[in-house]
Amino acid sequence: MYHYIEDKVFLKDMKYLCSNIINQLVQLINNDSLMEVKAHLVGSGAKNLITQNSNEPIDLDCNLMIIDSEININNCREIKEYIRKQFNVILNKNGWNDCMDSTSVLTTEKRHFTKGNHTEFSIDLAIVFNDRNGCHRLIHEKTGVTAWDRYYWNSVPDSRNLFDKVAAIKDEHLWDEVIDEYLEKKNMYLRRQDYNHPSFNVYVETVNQVFNKYFD
């Protein structure tokens, strides 16, 4: 079952290392002329939402949000390929291997610290953008034949005004309820063997549930 990471030293070191790599990626892309992006760990604005399933490796979920793009926003294949190549530049520069292109994220190799906590961890980088309808996540649907693969934007349900809802919850000092409910939902989907709810979707679902309970 999922639990929150209690080793604060390990958590701090892992977040520092991975955030540094992601920040380098953001700077590399923003210094180019094709795209403007920003990045954040899923739920990291509120902290304390990094989970681990039993003793398995930790997936550090990060959203790379497109703010502006010279590449047509609907050209999902070109967008993902551009970001994948830039990500590999940064990973290689830091001594990491190339990332893997999965359906909804770019996944790094698993790493671990040589001192202290030896738990393995990796970065799962999702490519997203926001519009008036909410948040959309870039999907690469693989067919087995590269030329036939599909790339498209998948809407995250009920993600409209997410940041405003988070701010309202924090202002009323209700974030502990989000922390409790988020973990409960992660374990609920695990028990159901439902693997169609990425961490960000669970986060959005949790924020909406708490917001609707107190503000709707």
Give, region by region, the residue ranges found by the protein language model.
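Conserved catalytic core of two-metal-ion nucleotidyltransferases
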Residues: L28-M35, R77-N133
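Active-site nucleotide-donor binding segment shared across nucleotidyl transfer reactions
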Residues: I29-L60, L64-I73
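Helical scaffold of the NTase/Pol beta-like nucleotidyltransferase catalytic core
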Residues: M1-L41
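Right-hand nucleic-acid polymerase module
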Residues: K115-D216
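Intrinsic-disorder-associated interaction segments
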Residues: H3-C18, N72, C76, N196-F200, ...
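Predominantly extracellular/lumenal beta-strand repeat domains
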Residues: K47-L49, I67, E81, C99, ...
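Short glycine-rich, low-complexity/disordered patches
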Residues: Q24-V42, N92-T107, R192-E205, Y214-D216
